[in-house]
Amino acid sequence: MALIVDKHRPRSLDALTYHTELSERLRSLAQSGDFPHLLVYGPSGAGKKTRIVATLKELYGPGVEKIKIDARVFQTSSNRKLEFNIVASVYHLEITPSDVGNYDRVVVQDLLKEVAQTQQVDLSAKQRFKVVVINEADHLTRDAQAALRRTMEKYSPNLRLILLANSTANIIAPIRSRCLLVRVAAPTHKEICDVLASSAKKEGWPIVKGLHQRIAEESGRNLRRALLMYEAVYAQNEKVTDSTPIPPPDWEALIGQIAKEIMEEHTPARILQVRAKLYDLLTHCIPATIILKTLTFKLIPLIDDALKADVIYWSAFYEHRIRTGTKVIFHLEAFVAKFMRIFEMYLMSMDL
């Protein structure tokens, strides 16, 4: 059974319900005959991917939706083999090079070179170039981004790149200057409520406006999250009213539990217990930066105002370490230990 977030996903630019001006801009780009490289950025759950798939459909027609998943093997200079999944149609490829970590340069170089040197298979296609959609472009290493820049310069007649990112801050200037930047802003609370009402109508659920408003506020303007929360409410309750509780995601509840445990006891034994829970979150594919950010926001209301600036400083410090390092668990654990030390020192100063 498909989730409503997938089942009701708009398939064309006409079906998109908000940012209509942006949809019109994308349509005119697709029809112009001179489609540029795009860098599409904005917060999670704003609809970047949905808009790009709809734009590809405008570019090539319904054939874009006939996709398959290919497993490819790439070899590094040290003869290490990397297995990598590619989502592909006749007209486009979709890749997430950050899945292979620091070896993303190998994937970017080899795959894009191969695609760019291949002519369009479908001779009746509207466009003579192929499109490569790169997810999480802001997580690419500097080497991979440099390889990407060279590919953009060399193979632009046969290849167009669409980069998806949450922020442009981590993308090198030469790539930004070669792309048309498209910002997809997060939907407003009202726009989220309208989408929830539309989904309820399609599913035959009663429209509960108070619940829609609460979900829109709790989702942090993340439409994907709002739809998942909405479905969770209906999955767990037979009768839904304005006051029906909204269940938090399991990972968020676990981080809340970690925050309480950190506050209760400041010992090496407690750090070991917390480490096990952090490992659990990481093995369930929760990104380390999200864990750190959520944990910080859970801890902030529990501490005195005098400590808040210090805790936020160290959270930012270890977030930078996570982004530049490879063993994320070290930096998460270091933040927990640092917080315990700061809090313990504060308690000792209070006793004096």
Curated annotation (Swiss-Prot):
Record has 4Fe-4S as a keyword: no
Lineage top rank: taxon: Eukaryota
Quaternary structure (record): Heteropentamer of subunits rfc1, rfc2, rfc3, rfc4 and rfc5 that forms a complex with PCNA in the presence of ATP.
Its job: The elongation of primed DNA templates by DNA polymerase delta and epsilon requires the action of the accessory proteins proliferating cell nuclear antigen (PCNA) and activator 1.
Signal peptide interval: none
Predominant location: nucleus
One Pfam family per UniProt: RFC_C
Subcellular compartments: Nucleus
CDD domains: AAA
Gene Ontology CC entries for this record: Ctf18 RFC-like complex; DNA replication factor C complex; Elg1 RFC-like complex; nucleus; Rad17 RFC-like complex
GO biological process: DNA repair; DNA strand elongation involved in mitotic DNA replication; DNA-templated DNA replication; leading strand elongation; sister chromatid cohesion; UV-damage excision repair
Protein name from the UniProt record: Replication factor C subunit 5
A GO MF term: DNA clamp loader activity
Coiled-coil regions, chain positions: none
SMART domains named in the record: AAA
UniProt keyword terms in alphabetical order: DNA replication, DNA-binding, Nucleus
InterPro entries, alphabetized: AAA+_ATPase (IPR003593), DNA_pol3_clamp-load_cplx_C (IPR008921), DNA_Rep/Repair_Clamp_Loader (IPR050238), P-loop_NTPase (IPR027417)
Family: Belongs to the activator 1 small subunits family.
